[in-house]
């Protein structure tokens, strides 16, 4: 299903008044579209508060980004683990009440994570760039900014907050967006993790080329249902192309036990992204070690 980037009849603001013409298509058709529409509004507000030029100056003073892809490639364990710092989600609500991102990040680092993923979406995941900044100051592992990126502006936000990599979701971006955003990310020193969920999206990304790190999301973002068979099906269908382009494949979502990791690794995933399974445990370090070593 095509995801509309903004409402067909957006609200218009005149002075202190806001109005819109009601229309049957004015409501989002699924969760992902709802998130995208809200994100579009958030970006507009953020750009007013901090113009791009200010972000450029911040980024210019930063040390080089850490090698996210290199850390996954060189991981001592397989599959390599990207451990996620996540407080909540649209489908599960609050996942961790006692949310201390610094303590969680340090536990992940001690527990054997190769990289970390940090949710920066505030409206639906209760994250934020402030969380990313806190985690960056606490650990030395490469960090992924996990958000719904619709504008190059967000890549600057991610880098300014200390990210070493950024997520690009194929379902909400055109081919032109993917190619352009990848160039902007490269200029900023950011690694790109391109996320796909179905054969059409993976075919698009492989046809574009130049994306050595691809994530297969086992969660359908329109319904938030998960199925590990998604990784198995897509890796089998595109095995030759994935090998030819030397893709490092990440399986994302729905991974709760060592058997789940073994299953997606057998399908061809060299890394996994795990969040909820760890965030629900009192001792996240022990939970991560158990997931890695069984």
UniProtKB/Swiss-Prot annotation:
Record-given protein name: Indole-3-glycerol phosphate synthase
Reactions listed under catalytic activity: 1-(2-carboxyphenylamino)-1-deoxy-D-ribulose 5-phosphate + H(+) = (1S,2R)-1-C-(indol-3-yl)glycerol 3-phosphate + CO2 + H2O
EC identifiers of the protein: 4.1.1.48
Keywords: Amino-acid biosynthesis, Aromatic amino acid biosynthesis, Decarboxylase, Lyase, Tryptophan biosynthesis
PANTHER family the record matches: INDOLE-3-GLYCEROL-PHOSPHATE SYNTHASE (PTHR22854:SF2), TRYPTOPHAN BIOSYNTHESIS PROTEIN (PTHR22854)
Gene designation per UniProt: trpC
Metabolic or biological pathway, per its Swiss-Prot or TrEMBL entry: Amino-acid biosynthesis; L-tryptophan biosynthesis; L-tryptophan from chorismate: step 4/5
Pfam families reported for this sequence: IGPS
CDD domains: IGPS
InterPro entries: Aldolase_TIM, Indole-3-glycerol_P_synth, Indole-3-glycerol_P_synth_dom, Indole-3-GlycerolPSynthase_CS, RibuloseP-bd_barrel
Principal EC category: lyase
Family note: Belongs to the TrpC family.
GO terms, molecular function: indole-3-glycerol-phosphate synthase activity; phosphoribosylanthranilate isomerase activity
Keyword match Lyase: yes
GO biological process: L-tryptophan biosynthetic process
